[in-house]
């Protein structure tokens, strides 16, 4: 059985046993070695380059690999097959999907102003901030030979008195740890739960000083995932962060993700990539940053496109791309954090913003709601320009929407220098109109060298080239320009 050694730039080598004829890109994915493949391995993007260091691969020159590069050992992993033992070098850019965790500066005036404006606008539209979750600290008499009331009844009586409710529900996940927590804290505890009319449903029992009740809002983009923790009592933001979507190594757009999840074991791989590799680490990081415990998250909401929603819950998404393009669900009720093994409170409801169609999902539902165009007399245009691009047009009388694939057109597609907004990407550009000298801004630490151009950089460059009359309105270079060769 052949062995393939992946020498990852800046990382430890990974050795994998395989069979003759195995596709190198598929082998790398099975070994969790990240190789950038926006087209998901169909050979059209030319981004999945690796370098053969030792041994042989069945691979041939292509339009993406010149004869000179081929002689140097460069290959496309998607079109390379294993023929025996070999060692390949994987460039660091291949792990670009593993974007470094970024935590926002919540004290910045811009962050505060945007959030406050959103809340104010929703309130004016009749959507008020409400909270049915409670954290109550109760003290109970410790049991004795003269007081043999069981723990659950002791807690129930204390909560009925503290909250003025008629009924208290203690679910299994709380009951199994109740005895330990009560005695560890001398029967002085904080109980968190949901107040539903005259019923209080316990969700967590913990130390009396742990009184935080937290909400978690998640935007699952095809390329980037952003998360916000909020205080459910005050509505204030506690922490905010973002990271790359771990699914990116299975394709840059939703079509390639759907194709990949249709392969044997594909759904589990893509669900693990978004949950275990992406969401769970962000939750742990933000809870630590905010100084709260993960079980304090009592409610979660998710905004994502239709395909991302399917892959999140592990539902087959094939019907999304097949005629007549009918998703498995628009609205999903009753989903809990424990169903997805998310490290929040196991009983936390997970609200998935409803999808509208196969390619217009809950992210647009949420964005339309937050933008307020649904409650305005003026005709407005709401644009979400990400990996998936969506547009909503209308006012309080009507709303129409459409979608397209936007990000890969800039980042992978047929732009040889295109890349995502990770280290080494040119993200902004200005051109001096007199000297025609360009100045660029590059993602990464100081001294970072340019590797390619991301979407915002390409838009900036085109804008500057046109402003300085280096290109014309048709996008063609003006040949008499002093900098044109």
Placement of each model-derived feature along the sequence:
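A glycine-rich phosphate-binding loop feature that marks nucleotide/adenosyl-phosphate handling sites
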Residues: 47, 296-306, 385-387, 478-484
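Eukaryote-biased recognition of intrinsically disordered, low-complexity regulatory segments
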Residues: 1-14
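Glycine-rich phosphate-binding loop of actin/hexokinase-like ATP-binding domains
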Residues: 218-222, 227-255, 319-333, 366, ...
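N-terminal phosphate-binding loop and adjacent alpha-helix
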Residues: 246-289, 414-415, 424-430
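Gly/charged contiguous loops adjacent to phosphate- or pyrophosphate-bearing nucleotide/cofactor binding elements
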Residues: 461-485
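Nucleotide/phosphate-binding catalytic cleft detector across ATP-hydrolyzing
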Residues: 69-71, 76-217, 222, 234, ...
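N-terminal cofactor/phosphate-binding cores enriched in small/glycine residues
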Residues: 17-61, 227, 241, 282, ...
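Iron-sulfur (Fe-S) cluster-binding segments and ferredoxin-like electron-carrier domains
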Residues: 27-31, 36, 47-97
């Amino acid at each position: 059985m052949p062995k393939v050694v992946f020498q990852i730039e800046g990382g430890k080598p990974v050795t994998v046993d395989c069979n003759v004829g195995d596709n190198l890109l598929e082998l790398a994915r099975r070994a969790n070695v990240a190789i950038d493949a926006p087209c998901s391995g169909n050979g059209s993007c030319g981004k999945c380059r690796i370098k053969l260091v030792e041994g042989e691969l069945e691979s041939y020159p292509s339009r993406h690999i010149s004869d000179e590069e081929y002689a140097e050992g460069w290959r496309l992993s998607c079109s390379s097959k294993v023929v025996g033992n070999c060692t390949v070098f994987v460039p660091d850019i291949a792990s670009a999907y593993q974007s470094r965790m970024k935590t926002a500066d919540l004290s910045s005036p811009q962050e505060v102003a945007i959030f406050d404006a959103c809340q104010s606008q929703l309130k004016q539209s009749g959507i008020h901030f409400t909270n049915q979750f409670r954290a109550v600290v109760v003290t109970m008499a410790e049991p004795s030979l003269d007081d043999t009331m069981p723990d659950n009844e002791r807690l129930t009586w204390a909560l009925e008195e503290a909250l003025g409710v008629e009924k208290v529900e203690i679910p299994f996940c709380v009951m199994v740890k109740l005895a330990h927590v009560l005695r560890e804290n001398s029967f002085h505890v904080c109980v968190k739960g949901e107040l539903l009319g005259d019923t209080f449903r316990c969700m967590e029992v913990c130390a009396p000083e742990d009184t935080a009740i937290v909400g978690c809002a998640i935007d699952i983009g095809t390329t980037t995932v952003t998360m916000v923790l909020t205080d459910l009592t005050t509505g204030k933001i506690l922490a905010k962060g973002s990271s790359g979507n771990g699914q990116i190594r299975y394709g840059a757009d939703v079509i390639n993700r759907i194709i990949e999840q249709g392969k044997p074991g594909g759904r589990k791989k893509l669900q693990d990539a978004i949950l275990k590799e992406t969401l769970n680490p962000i939750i742990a990081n933000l809870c630590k940053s905010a100084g709260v415990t993960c079980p304090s998250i009592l409610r979660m909401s998710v905004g994502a496109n239709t395909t991302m929603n399917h892959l999140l819950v592990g539902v087959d998404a094939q019907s999304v791309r097949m005629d007549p393009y009918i998703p498995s669900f628009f609205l999903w009720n009753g989903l809990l954090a424990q169903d997805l093994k998310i490290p929040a409170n196991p009983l936390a409801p997970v609200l998935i913003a409803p999808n509208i169609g196969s390619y217009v999902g809950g992210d647009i539902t949420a964005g339309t709601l937050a933008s307020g165009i649904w409650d305005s007399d003026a005709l407005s245009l709401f644009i979400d320009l990400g990996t998936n691009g969506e547009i909503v047009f209308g006012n309080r009388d009507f709303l129409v929407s459409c979608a397209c694939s936007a990000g890969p057109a800039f980042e992978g597609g047929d732009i040889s220098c295109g890349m995502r907004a990770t280290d080494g990407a040119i993200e902004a550009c200005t051109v001096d109109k007199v000297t025609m000298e360009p100045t660029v801004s590059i993602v990464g630490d100081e001294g970072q060298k340019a590797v390619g151009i991301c979407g915002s950089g390409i838009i900036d460059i085109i804008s500057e080239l046109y402003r300085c009359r280096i290109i014309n309105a048709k996008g063609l270079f003006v040949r008499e320009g002093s900098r044109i060769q």
